[in-house]
A protein has these predicted regions:
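Residue-level detection of the helix-turn-helix DNA-binding "recognition helix"
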Residues: 35, 49-50, 60
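Basic, helix-initiating cap at the start of DNA-binding domains
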Residues: 1-23, 27-36, 53
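Hydrophobic/aromatic-rich alpha-helical bundle segments in the mid-to-C-terminal region
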Residues: 121, 151-192
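Short hydrophobic/aromatic patch on the recognition helix
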Residues: 38-48
């Protein structure tokens, strides 16, 4: 009879994350995660079909939490600026509210990228995920842009969809490069 282990999926994810961060991507294996969790290799494969899916699963869980906080920042921007009126009509965020939202979003991205900097800079992980990078990057940019569209409505010179994607692309690029909000915030706020 198979043994029942409570929260085994979470334990596997936590152990895989720990090993990747402490030992590196190439050192973490399905076997090492199984051994550390006291389960058979087959048990890990019941939850994750590959090492790459195991890694993607713990990164995705943290990304989703990051996106919840980013969405909240964008909603707060709209709520804080709900008494401000755009010259063409309708409620919008003011520049202070937009700056606060952009800073909050950037800070969330910085926390996420700092948490996974070891993984993002790991050469063997980079080689493994190189083929899927363009597709995943586009997906991340779109996910990041979506909540920002609510305050990009104020900008009438360009499409709000494009403006949100433009800001998202810059934030992704510069957080990964280790730049601070102070370095790019004054440029981004000029778009509004």
């Amino acid at each position: 009879m198979p043994k029942i282990i409570e929260n085994i999926r979470e334990k596997l994810l936590d152990e895989a994350r720990r090993q990747v961060m402490e030992l590196g991507y190439s050192a973490m294996t399905i076997r090492s995660v199984a051994r550390a969790c006291g389960v058979g290799v087959g048990t890990v494969y019941n939850y994750f079909p590959s090492k790459d899916m195991l890694v993607a699963s713990f990164v995705l869980a943290d990304w989703q939490e990051c996106m919840v906080r980013i969405g909240q920042s964008c909603r707060e921007c709209v709520e804080a600026g709900s008494n401000l009126k755009h010259p063409v009509g309708g409620s919008v965020c003011g520049s202070n509210e937009v700056d606060t939202a952009l800073r909050s979003i950037y800070d969330e991205l910085r926390r996420f990228t700092e948490k996974y900097r070891t993984l993002f800079q790991d050469e063997s992980a980079g080689a493994t995920f190189a083929t899927s990078f363009p597709q995943r990057h586009k997906q991340l940019r779109s996910q990041l842009a979506e909540p920002m569209q609510v305050f990009c409505q104020v900008q009438s010179r360009v499409s709000p969809d494009f403006l949100a994607e433009f800001i998202a692309e810059n934030m992704l690029t510069w957080t990964l490069a280790g730049r601070t909000y102070e370095e790019i915030g004054s440029i981004l706020i000029q778009l509004f």
